[in-house]
Amino acid sequence: MNKVESALSRTTDTKALVIGTETLPQVADMFRKLFPDKRALVVADANTWRVAGDDVHKILAGAGVAQDEPYVFTDPKLYAEWAYVGELDTVLSETDAVPVAVGSGVINDLTKLCSSHNGRRYMVVGTAASMDGYTAYGASITKDGNKQTFDCPAPLGMVLDPNIAAAAPAKLSASGYADLIAKIPAGADWMLADAVGSELMDDFAFSVVQDGLKEALCDPAGVHAGNVAKVEQLAEGLLLSGFAMQATQSSRPASGAEHQFSHLWDMEHLKYNGASVSHGFKVGIGTLASTAFLEMLLETPVEELDVEKCVAAWKSWEETEADIRRIFDNDPEFVARGLVETLSLI
């Protein structure tokens, strides 16, 4: 049993995965097996329609799969934001067709959540190795200014052709690489959480994520250059991370402190040169900070700490609340979340 087959044995949602070159024609066969006698509805944006959506539509048609008219988002600034959830919800509410998402993070998350809203499953055709959310339980959507994870099942099936992913803009693969390398400090964080009894280790999920990292991350230059084999390794590592999250119904196997930096910057609507920053890039910078802290911790002679003195010096809740309000400049959105999350640790 290979790594993917082993991971699929524990997944709660995804039951089929095909990853390999020239695999796009297998979309029709997978659809018919997973959704017999159902209609299909291809969901894409302008870019993903061009690189794969039109082909998927034609492949399904050629195999005799009945289809609704494809739904292609036309906004060039499409984002995983609640307004677009409403847009796709409206489309799906008027049909019983099964969505076939063609895209990466944004298209997949929008389709994942809207499929759940409308009481059906979906499948996805990946177009980039840009993040680990394809096969993860839950969708990351911005609502009321906050990036939130909404509970919803992962796709029932997925197809990814690394030829297509390798041809995507290099920044997408770079984002995926950063998201995957973050699993190293995330794994260390989990070991620490397990050691203090906070979040118990799941050995299977831990190994699904960690065992293939060295291979998947071994050639960043090859990934950047669009080497198909290296992008395929990267994509497999990302998908395995998603499967681990499915198995545990938690993001714990694939994220740690480095992701908290990303969530904060999501709330601050971080932009670079006027454009939103990808999840992977934010996590990548968070990884630098997280690993720096871990290195500092390893260099600290914790056995010499005066625990009683540290406890006595701990600030009162009133002082902590004042710090939260000062740090977040009394912004009600940040203060409310900061208070709730800090109280949960006390």
Residue ranges and their predicted role:
Residues 208-346:
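Active-site segments that bind and position negatively charged phosphate/pyrophosphate groups
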Residues 92-114, 118-128:
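A short, small-residue-rich loop immediately preceding and capping a beta-strand
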Residues 102, 131-135, 277:
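Active-site histidine-anchored catalytic micro-motif
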Residues 1-98:
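ATP/NTP phosphate-donor binding region
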Residues 43-44, 103, 160:
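Short beta-strand/turn micro-motifs composed of small residues
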Residues 9-11, 34-35, 91-94, 115, ...:
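Solvent-exposed alpha-helices and their adjacent loops that cap or buttress functional pockets
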Residues 116-215:
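A glycine/threonine-rich phosphate-anchoring loop and its flanking beta-alpha core
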